[in-house]
Design a protein with these regions (language model features):
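Feature for intrinsically disordered/low-complexity regulatory segments and propeptides
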Residues: 1-71
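Intrinsically disordered, low-complexity regions enriched in serine/threonine
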Residues: 1-30, 89, 104-305
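A short acidic/basic microdomain associated with nuclease active sites
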Residues: 77-103
């Protein structure tokens, strides 16, 4: 597909413009016939429907959808020339733009993707990372590689695709190696309950073995915990009682049980920016840093401390 075809097929064939915003003195209580003053701020407006997506300063450089998709393709080309366009979406009315490109010949149990996300509301700069989709359950996991390195919107913007590609290539290798390790590491009952307690942000004073006590957690929290445990049981049954199965239990919950169909029908925004993303990131950090963290705590758990 050409760039123009991608924009059209993805309903991203619209542009944004920066327009000055005006204000009045507060005591006028919005009098349309009174004098208006330039506020010093600008609105970022879609040119097709006139919707204001965000507010910015004069220094902010708006980025067009065409540029975002083109930069994503440049990054993917620098990482691995053997890629295909997968999808592009406008999130939350176009406030953010998401582009995903599939790395061909991924093989194995999951497909691998490069993703790029940028904003039209000024909330983030161009950010990037690696995602994977487990074929058996369609669980998606998005891991950013750009934290602290996102590309800001300035007139001299330079995405430095080669440098970004090095970050992503290193992340691809690291993720693959960690997943291999997860598949060969058993998940104990303690690890499961520790993950549940951590991702659900239950009080640290709660004993993992007593989470179900109605006097300790609310009914709503108990129902959420029970649903997460059901998802973990499903995935560990299918994928084995391993940390890989445990991780997929969490991602199954965030992918298939947490929903906001009105704002996020694709389910992508929640996996990138909302609590679902935080839960996945917490679970990933826990299982990939198992070592002494789990071992020391499990000894206390087994000793009844």
């Amino acid at each position: 597909m050409t760039l123009k075809e991608i924009l059209s097929a993805s309903q991203l064939d619209w542009e944004v413009e920066k327009v000055p915003l005006f204000s009045q003195r507060p005591e006028l209580h919005f009098d349309p016939h009174s004098t208006w003053f330039e506020s010093g701020y600008y609105g970022i407006r879609r040119t097709d429907n006139m919707q204001i997506l965000g507010v910015c300063t004069k220094q902010y450089q708006e980025t067009q959808n065409e540029q975002i998709v083109e930069r994503a393709m440049q990054i993917a080309e620098a990482v691995n020339g053997d890629y295909t366009f997968h999808k592009a979406l406008a999130l939350n009315g176009g406030k953010k733009i998401f582009v995903q490109l599939k790395i061909e010949n991924s093989g194995g149990e999951y497909d691998k993707y490069i993703f790029v996300v940028d904003s039209n509301d000024g909330s983030i700069g161009l950010s990037y990372g690696i995602s994977n989709t487990v074929l058996s359950c369609a669980n998606q996991l998005f891991l950013f590689a750009s934290k602290g390195k996102s590309v800001k919107h300035t007139k001299s913007i330079d995405i430095k695709a080669d440098e970004i590609a090095l970050d992503l290539q290193a992340q691809l290798i690291d993720i693959d190696n960690k997943i291999i390790d997860l598949k060969h590491t058993s998940a104990s009952d303690f690890m499961i309950r520790k993950i549940v307690k951590t991702v659900m942000k239950l009080p640290v004073t709660i004993d993992e073995r007593l989470y179900h006590d109605g006097d300790i957690v609310s009914k709503k929290t108990k129902n959420r915990v029970d649903k997460l445990l059901d998802c973990i049981a499903k995935e560990t049954t299918e994928k084995g009682d391993t940390l890989w199965g445990l991780l997929n239990g969490v991602t199954y919950y965030t992918n298939h049980e947490i929903k906001n169909m009105d704002r996020d029908p694709s389910g992508i925004e929640k996996l990138l920016f909302s609590n679902a993303n935080k839960m996945n990131q917490i679970a990933w950090n826990c299982v990939t840093k198992k070592g002494g963290i789990f071992d020391a705590m499990e000894n206390k758990y087994n000793d009844g401390i």
